Curated annotation (Swiss-Prot):
The modification Phosphothreonine is found at T378, T600, T1059, T1163, T1179, T1185, T1226. It comes from the Eukaryota. It comes from Homo sapiens. Signal peptide: none annotated. GO terms for cellular component: cilium; intercellular bridge; microtubule cytoskeleton. Antibodies against KIAA1671 are present in sera from patients with breast cancer who developed several autoantibodies. Residues 38-131, 158-282, 299-320, 355-431, 456-604, 627-696, 860-901, 969-989, 1000-1019, 1134-1178, 1216-1265, 1291-1493, 1512-1627, 1642-1806 are annotated as: Disordered. Residues 1649-1666 have a biased composition (Basic residues). Pfam families: Tankyrase_bdg_C. Residues 51-70, 82-100, 456-470, 1753-1764 have a biased composition (Low complexity). The modification Phosphoserine is found at residues 52, 56, 79, 87-88, 92, 128, 244, 284, 366, 384, 404, 458, 508, 749, 969, 981, 1063, 1154, 1224, 1366, 1441, 1488, 1506, 1555, 1662, 1701, 1757, 1760, 1786. This is Uncharacterized protein KIAA1671. Residues 226-236, 386-400, 412-422, 524-549, 564-573, 641-652, 661-674, 969-978, 1169-1178, 1244-1254, 1317-1331, 1393-1410, 1426-1437, 1462-1483, 1522-1531, 1667-1677, 1689-1714 have a biased composition (Basic and acidic residues).
Length: 1806
């Protein structure tokens, strides 16, 4: 994408010798314009063809506009030439020109390829012309990641949309077809434009979405491709996918592009993409391209710093356009950014169409089709070119093959295949090229500048090139031959390109991570906040960034400095937004990528441009992979040097491309580079200082981007000083890993692999910081295992290596960092750099968190250094430090092997090897299966997740989740862990910051404990760390923003995103006992991601491997809530109490999970650490203040968690303790966590049992009960566990993870997993995998939403959720099994649904994400209602959770009611009570609606599957039946929607928040009142109603009304005592039918109300009167009046009223308000005209004789209440009926309240 094409670095890049060539192509620096050009897709090729760097630059500026035209193939070449030229900065000399012919040829094909790639990768990564084209394709992967984000995610479309979007949409043409079409539409609808506007957000959210979708790109890009073109099943390619994983971003975007154009699978998405329809647009894009490129480039530069756009642009256009376009396009892209975004989407679509046409056409269709259609086959061909190109074929093939599974895991097997073929050849070739990389490094050194340019761009080029090459191979042999010739010419560049591919892969991971972490969570928040606003970090930062990012090429240093600060903020946001360095690298890197270009130019100018060029992550990653990879591959012997070089490079790279995302990271990385890199030898002190300074540096480094600049200069210069080329390359390589680790850190050379692992580790290590301890053992294995888990695994591997390596690296960071320092500081540097990156990514919202993390790292380095270094030095240190590689291998054999094997088998390693590493021996087989399964399941999930992401602009978190998770189930799990790691790391960064700064030194062991859990968590939930970094960043952001919604959204998104992978994970789990355990745990981790509550749920799953819960639970919880403490305490408790068992289970689980080696080790480690962990967690929780604050903020914002907590504490002091622990975990953590471990264990077991139960029926239930009882050891724990279990059972299937898991999970880290682990793993694993996959997906969505909320407010999870559980415990204590049985039934039914929900969940996600769209929401709501009805029916049997429901009523009447129609129905109330805060938060966040909807939808998967439409129909029909009551109900419903809803929401929110129980009751009671005062409420309740509306509206008006009716019903029932309320709610569940009707009514009512808005006041009055009369004379008349009145009264009452009106009009025309009451009287008595008359006369006389005349003035006064009053009267009876129903329990006071409220409202209205 042109956006990132800027690599201000091109100028500095030009400084590089090879960049001298690039020098001509200073435009290359501007190349980031290319994205626009590449938007055309062909322009890259054409530009490649035109290739005159000068002309390219000249054209580059126009090309942005021409880019779309070049997209036409003719201009395409021209556009690409400038873009490609710059992109070709590195490759252009070596392969740029050579590639030019191929690029030309490719251009013809490449319109789709480049179009796709440009659209997808935007070709910025296409370091060379062909690379532009091919790399565009590969950048397609990278960009596509962005693009996929664009397509899949709103951001992607947006980010890609930015100027680069032209190119990207060009790619989008291919990929957007898949992703853009969904993503574009989704993007646009979902908020693509918002993201688009903030291209950074565009890129970032896209990246997040694309990171989610393309970090998942391996999975999510795959998902997009899989989603868009699931047909790209060539799962066989899955192996390649890992290479593609790198590419997956580059390739995946490609794949979607070609897939869309060529691949039918992709094409189907393409049609939705309407890329073809917009095909003409490419010309427009050509015209617009320039502006788009400029505007988009500005945006994209900022954004692509943020996302692939920047990366693409940076890679292709940045080099090309960076110089020129950077200035021109920076300016122009900035202005057209939005245009390109919107226009670009259109143009991109057109380009896409055109490209797809071209792709469809013999050429493009063939290449892309080959990529997409022949994905499986062509990858080989693709590789063939790559083989030719990069002698990397064997390894590319191998790596591609291995990556394919990994990527395939990314779900994008087909995509991976095509991409792997295309990009995997590049990625695999690149990875395999690691050996080739050494050649490449030689080439890279030759091409050093070129390679740097190409390295950064070549990796991009690699993705594109492989894509291009494969495409020619595929589509057109001549093109293939051209590509081959191009490869031959570009042979050097190609290897570099492969490196780039490497970056592409990292991008994938980065994007996925970013998505997962930032896109979903922080991206939604930050990215939405920041990026949505043009990427706050990006647009504001982009301004600065535009200084450095946009102007990065133009103003490399200066912009970088502001960019640094900006990047810092933006990186924080990008990190927050893309908590995973990927997004950081992508979002931040987009910013920083140009910056790194600027920064790196001094050292690695080429790869600065390259970094910027490649993709944020792709470029960075590619550069890292190419340059670092090469160097690393070359330098592996000198592990230290390697690490050092790699690390210096990572510093530069990080500084370079991270320079963008984390200028701070660049600084950090550079500082790390400089302090680590050099400190490895020269800067052990600096490394430590960096650690010490990391925080200053992290924070300051960002701010000190000048330092970063200096560091860029110094670091890069130092890198140059060190090994200018080698070190430069390697550092960048490692940085890529740092990013890659974030992303997919797959471009690890043998030694760099360790480095990459280190950096990868870093990414996890971010999260793994806390994880490091646990990770030192498990993460190594897990790391390996995760790495074994397909593309995501690569990233997971990076993360696992970050966890395992951070086991080695994290400890290296802690102990290992010092160790690496001693080992060479390279690891430390890399780790630190990665940490910086990771930290940055992880701490999207926590720049200070990053800084704190730096401090934490420092502390870990220095403080935990000893503790961490000791355990981790040998085990972790080695993986981290290349010198430690052998040791690491010994200790972290899998991790190190991964790392070591990575160079050759990096891709393969990721799949098999990492599987082996991860699973030990079984891992490889198991992991691949999960990978495959995940791919399959993930494909849909990813697709859906992508949809989510796409639709999720508001809820970008989901994007992250979906994208992230689907990447591959193991990967997803790992990703989840990674997400959790980053999120937790983000929170934990703050926590770690606080705690680790405080506790690290205080509790180095504790720190390590945190790390250990983190590591362990990281193992299963690796991606979670990254993801959750974002999530936590979101909490941070939320805290900062006070956007509970965002945080919850983030969590939701994470949860959602993670959820889909969860299902793949579950599938994977099923496939592999160990694998599935890991998958489940990963799913659990994903669940953790889903919410910190989900985290608890994840702990449930993760607890299966007790290690996991400890790491995930302890770690995740710690960051999010006291949960970490919980987990720590749990782990300590578990370690001590359940120590043997948890250890066994955990070991089993861990081993099953495939931390086998690490799990056992980790188990002991964790076990030993948990004791520290409690301390650390305590401290952490104390330091969790920040997260706790966030949590508290969540709680406060989401729901009056304090009130809830008070009640919750009362109800379940232990649970509240848990929540309190989170609040003040310091005191309780040790005690409560230990109790809770059992509790949670029991609950988790119970829940797991419940989850299993569907499979194992009552077996698990009893076991679960027994275990829960066992877990109940703590009395309250038991209650809670039971309650949780009940809640779990009740909400087991949909809210299984939603609420119960979080609360239980919080408790069950210790208890449940122990006993339930093995069988739960078995039964639960399989069934849960299925149901967990589908339901998890659903529950993920739901639980994201539900748990995301709690996640946002973990206390809500622990407090609110526990609170609900606590009450259910009271209620269900005796009936936990009942609840469980019902939950079980529900679970079974729901799980039965959920498998379908798997497919449905994506839709649900779509719906959820398009919560804006009432249809999906309505469908969702209808299905939810349907299911809610079923659930309500079921609920009676599960009514034991009455208390839960009461709690729900207390906690979340709003959500409750909004969710009541959903999963709330079964245990909705109980769980949703818990979720109520979530829902409240949810309403706060639009995600909440989505959360609510998907959650419910998931709950009502069945209904939703058949129900959404059926329910809609039912609702439609119901509406008619409700019509009679609809006059009444309509008003009420309208009131509910407008006023009642709002009132309910307000009441629910306020009351639920203030007094959950009474509030719920009040809210429930009030809903009728609200309806009565619909007019009054109409305006007033909007805020609460908005909450409600968030969930309701998201459910659609129908859903709203179903909820409203439920509310009414519930409200009517709810008003009854809490206990009665739940019972009534049971009855209310039947109201779901009414709810459906009410929904319809609500819609009709809304219309009518809008029509009779004036009447509504009177209606309100009438209702008030009715209520008044009801209150005064509550007689059956009300019911009769209600019934008769509905029919009779409408006619009879009208005449009496008219008569009365005439009479009373004279009597008191002025007394309209009083008449309201009399009217109400007549309304109820109205069944009898005479009686009505008498009563009306009477009442008007009594209340206000003149009010009845109001009926006559009815016609007179437009507002005359009495026409509506008649209707209102009629309506009132309905309300009255509702009131009576509801008020029977508490009629008078509620009625009075309602009456008064309505009166006041009416008076106000009057």
């Amino acid at each position: 994408m042109a956006t990132r094409v800027e690599v201000g670095s091109i100028t500095p890049l030009t400084a590089v010798p090879g960049l001298g060539e690039m020098g001509k192509e200073e435009t290359l620096t501007r190349t980031y314009f290319l994205q626009a050009g590449e938007a055309s897709g062909a322009p890259p090729a054409r530009i490649l063809e035109a290739k005159s760097p000068l002309r390219s630059p000249a054209r580059l500026l126009p090309l942005p506009r021409l880019a779309p035209k070049p997209f036409s193939k003719e201009q395409d070449v021209k556009s690409p030439v400038p873009s490609l030229r710059p992109s070709s900065t590195g490759p252009s000399p070596s392969g740029g020109l050579s590639e030019e012919p191929a690029a030309k040829d490719l251009d013809n094909r490449m319109p789709g390829l480049v179009g796709q790639e440009v659209g997808s990768g935007e070709g910025p990564r296409t370091s060379s012309p062909l690379f532009n084209k091919a790399v565009f394709l590969r950048p397609s992967s990278s960009t596509m990641i962005l693009f996929e984000t664009t397509k899949s995610g709103p951001a992607l479309g947006k980010a890609v949309s930015e100027g680069a979007e032209e190119a990207k949409l060009g790619v989008s043409g291919s990929r957007p077809e898949v992703a853009a079409k969904p993503a574009l539409p989704t993007q646009k609808p979902a908020g693509t434009l918002p993201r688009s506007a903030p291209l950074s957000q565009d890129t970032k959210p896209p990246v997040p979405q694309e990171e989610a979708g393309q970090d998942h790109p391996p999975s999510k890009a795959s998902s997009v491709e899989d989603t868009a073109r699931p047909l790209v099943e060539p799962r066989p390619r899955l192996k390649r996918r890992p290479v593609s994983a790198i590419f997956t971003e580059s390739i995946q975007p490609q794949k979607p592009g070609p897939g869309a154009a060529a691949t039918v699978g992709k094409v189907p998405p393409t049609p939705p993409e309407k890329t073809w329809v917009r095909k003409p647009r490419p010309l427009s894009m050509d015209l617009t391209a320039r502006f788009e490129n400029k505007e988009a480039l500005l945006r994209k530069v900022a954004d692509e710093g943020s996302g692939p756009t920047a990366g693409d642009m940076a890679g292709l256009e940045r080099p090309r356009a960076a110089s020129k376009l950077d200035r021109d396009c920076l300016v122009k892209a900035e202005a057209p950014l939005h245009d390109p975004d919107l226009d670009f989407l259109e143009v991109a679509k057109k380009i896409r169409e055109r490209k797809e046409k071209m792709l469809s056409k013999p050429e493009m269709g063939s290449p892309r089709a080959l990529v997409g259609g022949s994905s499986g086959v062509t990858p080989s061909n693709d590789q063939s070119p790559w083989e030719e190109k990069a002698k990397l074929d064997p390894e590319p093939e191998k790596a591609a093959e291995s990556p394919s599974p990994r990527l395939g895991r990314g779900l994008e097997l087909a995509e991976v295949k095509s991409r792997v073929a295309d990009g995997e050849a590049a990625a695999g070739g690149e990875w395999a090229s690691r050996r080739s990389v050494r050649k490449c490094i030689s080439l890279f050194r030759e091409d050093s500048t070129l390679a740097l340019a190409v390295g950064s761009e070549s990796p991009l080029a690699t993705p594109a090139s492989p894509s291009a090459a494969p495409e020619p191979e595929k589509g057109v042999v001549s093109v293939q031959e051209r590509i081959r010739g191009w490869t031959a010419e570009s042979s050097e560049a190609k290897p570099e390109v492969r490196r780039r591919t490497f970056q592409a892969r990292p991008l994938s991971a980065d994007l996925t991570k970013l998505f997962s972490s930032s896109a979903s969570s922080n991206e939604v928040k930050y990215e939405k906040s920041a990026e949505l606003s043009g990427e706050f970090p990006k647009e504001p930062r982009e301004k600065q960034k535009e200084g450095h990012s946009l102007d990065g090429a133009c103003i490399p240093r200066s912009p970088w400095k502001p960019g640094t600060l900006r990047d810092k903020s933006r990186q924080t946001e990008q990190k927050v937004s893309s908590n995973q360095d990927p997004d950081s690298c992508r979002g931040g890197s987009s910013v920083e990528a140009p910056c790194p270009s600027d920064v790196t130019p001094e050292d690695d100018r080429s790869f600065q441009t390259v970094w910027a060029t490649v993709f944020e992550h792709h470029v960075e990653r590619h550069t890292v992979a190419d340059q670092s990879g090469r160097c690393l591959s070359t330098t592996p012997p000198g592990d230290m040097a390697h690490a050092r070089v790699s690390e210096p490079r990572p510093r530069p790279e990080m500084g370079s491309w991270l320079g963008r995302d984390p200028p701070d990271m660049t600084k950090l990385k550079k500082e790390n580079s400089r302090g680590f890199d050099n400190p490895e030898t020269e800067k052990l002190g600096p490394t430590t200082l960096l650690n010490g300074e990391l925080r200053p540096y992290h924070t300051p480094l960002r701010d000190k981007y000048p330092l970063s600049e200096n560091h860029n200069n110094n670091t890069f210069l130092k890198h140059l000083e060190n090994p200018p080329t080698s070190q430069r390359i390697e550092p960048r390589y490692d940085i890529v890993h740092a990013v890659g680790e974030r992303v997919h850190s797959e471009a690890i050379s043998p030694a760099p692999e360790e480095k990459a692992v280190t950096l990868r580790s870093l990414r996890s290590w971010l999260s793994l910081k806390d994880r490091q301890l646990s990770q030192e053992v498990t993460p190594a294995d897990l790391e390996c295992g995760l790495e074994g888990q397909a593309g995501s695994v690569q990233r997971a591997s990076l993360i696992w290596e970050a966890r395992g390596m951070p086991e080695a690296s994290g400890p290296k960071f802690g102990g290992n960092c010092p160790f690496p320092k001693w080992t060479g500081g390279a690891v430390v540097s890399s780790h630190k750099a990665t940490v910086a990156v990771s930290e940055e990514h992880c701490a999207p919202g926590a720049t200070s968190v990053r800084a704190i993390k730096a401090a934490i790292w420092e502390s870990q380095h220095e403080g935990p250094e000893g503790a961490r270094s000791k355990p981790g030095v040998g085990a972790r240190g080695p993986p981290q430090g290349c010198p430690l590689d052998p040791l690491s291998r010994a200790t972290n054999g899998p991790s190190d092997s991964q790392a070591r094997t990575h160079p050759d088998a990096f891709a393969v390693q990721k799949g098999p090897f990492i599987v082996a590493a991860r699973e030990g021996d079984p891992g490889p087989a198991q992991v691949p299966q999960p990978a495959v399964r995940m791919r399959k399941a993930g494909a849909m999930d990813q697709r859906m997740d992508r949809w989510r992401r796409r639709t999720l602009p508001p809820n970008v978190k989901f994007d992250t989740f979906s994208s992230l998770v689907p990447e591959d189930s193991p990967h997803v799990g790992h990703r989840r862990t990674d997400y959790v790691s980053p999120t937790a790391s983000a929170l934990r960064k703050p926590q770690l910051s606080h705690y680790r700064v405080e506790t690290q030194e205080v509790n180095p062991g504790a720190s390590r404990d945190q790390t250990s859990p983190a590591v362990k968590q990281g193992s299963p939930v690796e991606p979670k760390a990254t993801f959750f970094a974002v999530t936590y960043q979101i909490p941070n952001t939320q805290k900062a923003k006070g956007v509970v919604l965002s945080g919850a959204e983030s969590l939701l998104e994470h949860s959602r995103k993670i959820t889909p992978p969860s299902s793949p994970h579950s599938l994977t789990s099923t496939l592999v006992s160990l694998g599935h355990e890991e998958a489940l745990e990963m799913a659990g981790s994903k669940n953790w991601m889903k919410g910190r509550e989900h985290e608890n749920a994840s702990i449930l799953k993760t607890l299966k491997p007790t290690d996991r819960p400890s790491s995930l639970g302890a770690w995740s919880l710690d960051p999010f809530n006291g949960r970490i403490i919980d987990v720590d305490a749990l782990w300590s408790h578990r370690g001590s109490e359940d120590g043997p068992r948890p250890q066994s289970n955990w070991k089993e689980s861990a081993n099953k999970m495939s931390p086998s080696g690490g799990a056992p080790q980790t188990t002991p480690t964790l076990r030993s650490r948990p004791k520290d962990l409690p301390v650390r967690r305590k401290t952490d929780v104390i330091s969790d203040t920040f997260p706790g604050k966030i949590r508290d903020g969540y709680r406060s914002s989401v729901l009056d968690i304090d009130a809830l907590m008070a009640e919750y504490q009362e109800l379940s002091l232990k649970v509240p303790g848990e929540a309190q622990e989170r609040r003040s975990p310091t005191v309780e953590p040790s005690t409560l966590p230990r109790e809770r471990p059992v509790q949670l264990g029991g609950v988790e077991q119970r829940r797991r049992s419940l989850k299993e139960m569907p499979d194992t029926g009552g077996l698990w239930k009893p076991a679960s009960s027994a275990e829960i009882n066992h877990s109940f050891t703590p009395g309250l724990g038991k209650q809670l566990a039971e309650t949780l279990e009940t809640a779990m059972g009740t909400k087991s299937s949909p809210p299984f993870w939603a609420l119960p898991p979080s609360a239980p999970s919080e408790r069950y880290p210790g208890g449940s997993p122990i006993p339930a682990d093995p069988r739960k793993k078995t039964g639960f694993a399989e069934d849960d995998r299925k149901a967990f996959a589908s339901k998890h997906h659903v529950a993920k969505c739901q639980n994201y939403l539900a748990e995301s909320k709690p996640s946002g407010r973990e206390d809500p999870g622990s407090g609110v959720r526990v609170s609900p559980k606590s009450p259910p415990t009271d209620q269900k204590k005796g009936t936990p099994r009942k609840s469980t049985g019902r939950g079980e039934e529900d679970s079974v039914a729901q799980w039965g649904d959920h498998p379908r929900d798997c497919g449905r969940v994506p839709l649900d996600i779509k719906r959820a994400y398009s919560e804006k769209g009432p249809p999906a929401n309505i469908r969702e709501g209808l299905s939810i209602m349907h299911e809610a009805r079923e659930r309500r029916r079921e609920q009676p049997k599960g009514r034991p959770s009455l208390t839960g429901e009461n709690l729900e009523a207390k906690m979340g009447p709003c959500w409750w009611e909004s969710g009541t129609g959903d999963s709330h129905k079964v245990l909705p109330r109980d769980l949703e009570k818990e979720d109520a805060p979530q829902e409240k938060e949810r309403p706060l966040q639009q995600v909440s609606p989505v959360a609510s909807v998907p959650w419910r939808s998931h709950s009502f998967c069945k209904d939703r599957r058949s129900g959404p439409f059926v329910d809609q129909l039912k609702q439609c029909f119901s509406r008619q039946p409700t019509e009679p009551k609809d006059t009444d109900t309509l008003v009420h419903e309208a009131g509910s929607q407008y006023g009642t809803w709002t009132e309910q929401c307000q009441s629910g929110e306020s009351l639920a928040t203030e007094s959950p129980d009474s509030s719920a009751t009040s809210t429930r009671k009030q809903p009728p009142s609200s309806r009565l005062s619909s007019l009054s409420s109409q305006t007033e309740p909007t805020s609460a109603g908005d909450q409600y509306d968030c969930s309701r509206d998201q459910r659609s008006t129908s859903v709203d009304h179903s909820s409203t009716d439920l509310e009414s019903t519930d409200g009517m029932e709810g008003p009854p005592p809490p206990d009665a309320c739940p019972e009534k709610r049971v009855d209310d569940f039947s109201f779901i039918d009414q709810t459906s009707v009410l929904d319809s009514s609500a819609l009709k009512t809304r219309v009518q109300l809008s029509k009779r808005s004036r009447r509504r006041a009177p209606i309100s009055h009438s209702l008030r009167r009715s209520r008044f009369s009801e209150s005064e004379s509550r007689s059956p008349l009300e019911d009769e009046t209600d019934n008769t009145w509905m029919f009779k009264d409408s006619t009879e009452e009208k005449s009496p009223r008219k008569e009365e009106s005439d009479e009373e009009e004279t009597a008191s025309k002025a007394e309209r308000t009083p008449v309201s009451h009399p009217q109400r009287m007549p309304a109820f008595p109205g069944m009898d005209p005479a009686v009505l008359k008498a009563q009306l006369h009477k009442r008007p006389e009594v209340d206000s004789p003149g009010e009845t005349p109001s009926w006559a003035p009815q016609p007179k006064s437009p507002k005359s209440p009495f026409q509506p009053g008649v209707l209102g009267s009629r309506v009132l009876p309905s309300s009255m009926d509702k009131d009576e129903r509801s008020d029977e329990p508490s009629p008078q006071w509620l009625k009075e309240l309602k009456s008064k409220k309505r009166q006041s409202l009416y008076e106000n209205q009057v």
